[in-house]
Regions:
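Helix-loop-helix module between adjacent transmembrane segments
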Residues: 66-74, 96-116, 121-151, 206-207, ...
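Hydrophobic alpha-helical segments and their helix-loop junctions in multi-pass secondary transporters
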Residues: 163-190, 205-221, 377-385, 410-418
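Transmembrane alpha-helical segments of multi-pass small-molecule transport proteins
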Residues: 102, 127-148, 165-169, 328-347, ...
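A generic transmembrane alpha-helix motif of multi-pass inner-membrane proteins
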Residues: 183, 193-199, 373-379, 392-418
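Loop-to-transmembrane helix boundary motifs in multi-pass membrane proteins
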Residues: 95-98, 133-136, 247, 291-293, ...
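Juxtamembrane transmembrane-helix boundary signature
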Residues: 32, 59-91, 101-111
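Flexible loop linkers connecting adjacent transmembrane helices
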Residues: 4-10, 44-49, 72-97, 122, ...
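Extracellular/periplasmic helix-exit of transmembrane alpha-helices
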Residues: 67-80, 221-222, 230, 250-279
């Protein structure tokens, strides 16, 4: 096994370090992982588990498989062309089409940032009793400060630490409950759509497969500029990137599954429907003990902060891409995009009447924009003019088109059920 890993992943430049070389290249995918363990996911997953038990675990699995294919394709674009998805959209699509696509993606990113900031604010209210609106301002300000003063590598280190805190928190929570693992295992692979579940299913999909993450992943990858280093380096990096994506998305799948399972074993089993994350934390205490609600709130705070940072970075990537530029926090187009995103997110937080419903519907909004981004991604990565010899194969194109069709069908189900 080790020899196989060395052969497949070993570096041609260094002579190969096998499995150790793999670990050195894990990082960009974890920036994406943060985006799908954000507070919007918490709201969607808690709603799914508390209302339908284990029944909707399958959508977490399906969404993660779709996410792996899409994120690998977005990273593929960045590695092969040296352009992120936003830059490539501006460069290769008609101007009015490119601006419309990026404009819709930017609005979806503001919706994302609103969910992240709102979730962090709810956590501050749980921990310190701060009003939600004041918490929104604090979370947005801290996130923007972290972005304005951090390089990619520093941001990666922050985020890996934050993901670790969230993951360990849910391991601790699951250790306190009795899980029906055979039922959970069956639900991971058995699709079902209980009555009234359409909006929750689409919100879980939107919470996992998020359009802003496709822009972010391609930007982080392309900033390393492998495209000018020759075919050997590009092909090597494609292998490393695939492992990074599989590992990172696997971590996200486990954490999202843990959220649904926790809600199913605590709330659904006791007939409690979660309509507020703060209420969810309070409801954990009598069932699992007082420490459980504190662990829940701390994990939510770290999830909110870290995902706010990546949402802001994605916003800056999109606005820079509108001008065919790379993301650079010290550049005017990037910094204005970041600042405007947080201002818009805070403004949305201030007018949302019900924070929990705001989280749920923000995720549904993301899934409505997602087909647009997926179509553009497929169009670009299947073009030999854009990708050269690294253009999508026919089987990969068929897979990506199938993913786009699933997303569109679920969106239609949501719209007809509203």
């Amino acid at each position: 096994m080790i020899n196989h890993l060395k052969h497949h992943f070993g570096s041609r430049r260094t002579g190969g370090h096998g499995g150790l070389d793999i670990a050195r290249h894990i990082g960009p995918g974890l920036l994406v992982t943060v985006g799908f363990i954000d507070p919007g996911n918490w709201a969607s997953n808690m709603a799914a588990g508390s209302q339908f038990g284990y029944a909707l675990l399958w959508i977490v699995t399906l969404s993660t498989i779709m996410l792996i294919a899409l994120q690998h394709n977005a990273a593929h674009l960045g590695i092969a062309t040296g352009a992120c998805l936003a830059e490539a959209t501006t460069r290769y699509l008609p101007r009015f089409v490119g601006r419309a696509v990026l404009g819709s993606a930017y609005l979806a990113t503001i919706a994302t940032a609103m969910a992240e900031v709102l979730g962090g604010a709810i956590a501050l209210q749980m921990l310190f009793g701060l009003p939600v609106r004041a918490g929104c301002v604090i979370v947005a300000a801290v996130s923007m400060a972290m972005l304005m003063t951090s390089s990619y590598k520093r941001a990666e280190r922050w985020i890996i630490a934050f993901v670790g805190v969230v993951g360990l928190s849910f391991l601790a929570e699951l250790a306190l409950v009795k899980v029906d693992w055979p039922q959970a295992a069956a639900s991971w692979i058995t699709p079902s759509m209980p009555s009234g579940s359409a909006a929750i299913i689409v919100s879980v999909l939107g919470a996992v497969v998020m359009p802003h993450n496709l822009f972010l992943h391609s930007e982080v990858i392309q900033s390393m500029h492998f495209e000018g280093q020759g075919e050997q380096i590009i092909e090597e990096r494609l292998r490393y990137e695939l492992f990074d994506t599989l590992f990172s998305m696997g971590v996200g799948w486990a954490i999202n599954s843990a959220m649904v399972i926790l809600a199913a074993t605590t709330f659904f089993a006791h007939g409690i429907v979660v309509e507020d994350l703060a209420v969810a934390a309070d409801a954990l205490s009598p069932i699992l003990g007082p420490a459980s609600s504190t662990i829940f709130a701390v994990a939510l705070l770290f999830a909110g902060l870290s995902s706010s940072v990546t949402a802001g970075m994605a916003a800056g990537t999109i606005t820079a891409g509108m001008f065919d530029e790379e993301y650079d926090i010290h550049d005017r187009h990037s910094s204005i995009g970041v600042a405007a995103c947080f201002v818009g997110a805070v403004a949305a937080c201030l007018v949302v009447p019900n924070p929990f419903e705001g989280l749920i519907w923000s995720q549904a909004l993301l899934s409505l924009q997602l087909p647009i981004t997926v179509v553009v991604l497929i169009r670009l990565t299947s073009s030999r003019r854009v990708m050269g010899k690294y253009a999508n194969s026919r089987p990969l194109n068929a897979l990506l088109v199938g993913i786009g069709a699933i997303v569109t069908i679920l969106d239609v189900v949501l719209l007809t059920g509203m």
